[in-house]
Amino acid sequence: MEQYQEDFVEFILDSGALKFGNFTLKSGRISPYFFNVGVFNTGQYLSQLGKFYAIAIENSGLDFDVLFGPSYKGIPLVTATAVAFNNNFNKDVSYSFNRKEVKTYGEGGGIVGHSLEGNILIIDDVITAGTAIHEAVDIIKANGATVKGVIVAVDRQEKGKSGQSAIQEVEQNFGISVFSIINLSNVVDYLKQGNNHALIDRIEVQR
């Protein structure tokens, strides 16, 4: 685990973004943990979050032209990450996001920010059912651009009915790369540093 990944695990635990208990996910599965990106509701939190995304993207070596954040949760993620690229890597990165309701007045259209052209990197929080990514891919292709990949904050590493994880299904269905700041194994490795054996056992059962 890289240092920035360990720092990110600490960040989501200290902020309360990663919670443990019994949660029903969008997919209908019951999970012993839940990642809530809505906790990052201050400028300081968003600044830190954007920096972690930017570091992970830089480390991936992925070449892209525009960052795209699916509305609504992807909007603060993509803007924070674009700012983080400028502040931490001196890179002026283009970004855009979609409107849920297409605007029929003013400049109109369904895309806000940079036009979708070239290679697009999608930013989201997690992939549970893959619905939001499917919609984002459709939007990007409809605008004549190419989906280069997807980055999420946390790879849950949970297998669905197909025997594959949601991320593996997205990679297979769309032929794109999906990577994350951290995955569940990173969280487990971090928890092993403390006396969290019962919690680790519950998490491992879901994998």
UniProtKB/Swiss-Prot annotation:
Similarity comment: Belongs to the purine/pyrimidine phosphoribosyltransferase family. PyrE subfamily.
Organism domain of life: Bacteria
Reaction(s) the record says it catalyses: orotidine 5'-phosphate + diphosphate = orotate + 5-phospho-alpha-D-ribose 1-diphosphate
Transferase among keywords: yes
Pfam families: Pribosyltran
Function of the molecule: Catalyzes the transfer of a ribosyl phosphate group from 5-phosphoribose 1-diphosphate to orotate, leading to the formation of orotidine monophosphate (OMP).
Protein name, as recorded: Orotate phosphoribosyltransferase
Entry GO CC: cytoplasm
Binding site for 5-phospho-alpha-D-ribose 1-diphosphate: 26, 72-73, 99-100, 103, 124-132
Swiss-Prot/TrEMBL GO biological process terms: 'de novo' pyrimidine nucleobase biosynthetic process; 'de novo' UMP biosynthetic process; pyrimidine ribonucleoside biosynthetic process
Lineage of producing organism: Bacteria, Pseudomonadati, Pseudomonadota, Gammaproteobacteria, Candidatus Pseudothioglobaceae
Protein keywords: Glycosyltransferase, Magnesium, Pyrimidine biosynthesis, Transferase
Species the sequence originates in: Vesicomyosocius okutanii subsp. Calyptogena okutanii (strain HA)
PROSITE patterns listed in its UniProt record: PUR_PYR_PR_TRANSFER (PS00103)
Assigned EC number: 2.4.2.10
SUPFAM superfamilies: PRTase-like (SSF53271)
InterPro entries per the UniProt record, alphabetical: OPRT, Or_phspho_trans_dom, PRibTrfase_dom, PRTase-like
Self-association and partners: Homodimer.
Designated gene of the protein: pyrE
